[in-house]
């Protein structure tokens, strides 16, 4: 089981989350996926360090510019070969995220509430399969990223209902 970490960077009211689009122009398992910045946990790293390193490598988010709030319970991929640790954080000030590597071709904020709408079955543009998710900015939000964001959305929704 390989371990990975993602940065779940939340900002604003209503809450938005930073996502990246994995490049559609390279032949990769993740091509055209809308994802949270993240990747493998290297030897000697913990999930926080890995998520912050990956956010810097993929979206020019410097580790000093975010405040980590919590680590959510890990999410297993459907293939079962990867365990993803979501690291929730907020910006300490203004950010200018942008693609920082050839594996990412877009970086943008989406409303967290988007995952409150039932996902549809759609054809993934780079895989020969249909997935349950959302089409966004030429990519597809689905799989473990979608499950992490839905879990976070339901936590936020229940917190907002309390008096």
Predicted segment positions?
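Buried hydrophobic packing segments
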Residues: 7-10, 145-152
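Short, contiguous, pocket-lining structural segments
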Residues: 35, 140-144
């Amino acid at each position: 089981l390989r371990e990975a970490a993602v940065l779940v960077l939340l900002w604003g009211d209503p809450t938005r989350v930073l996502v990246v689009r994995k490049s559609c122009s390279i032949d990769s398992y993740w091509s055209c996926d809308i994802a949270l910045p993240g990747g493998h946990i290297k030897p000697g790293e913990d999930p926080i360090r890995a998520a912050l390193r990956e956010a810097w490598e993929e979206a020019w988010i410097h580790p000093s510019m975010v405040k980590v709030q919590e680590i959510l319970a890990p999410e297993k991929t459907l293939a079962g070969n990867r365990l993803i640790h979501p690291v929730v954080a907020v910006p300490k000030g203004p950010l200018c995220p942008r693609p920082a590597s050839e594996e990412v071709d877009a970086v943008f904020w989406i409303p967290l509430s988007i995952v409150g709408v039932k996902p549809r079955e759609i054809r993934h543009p780079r895989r020969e399969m249909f997935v349950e998710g959302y089409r966004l900015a030429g990519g597809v939000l689905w799989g473990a990223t979608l499950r992490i964001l839905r879990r976070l959305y339901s936590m936020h929704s229940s917190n907002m209902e309390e008096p």
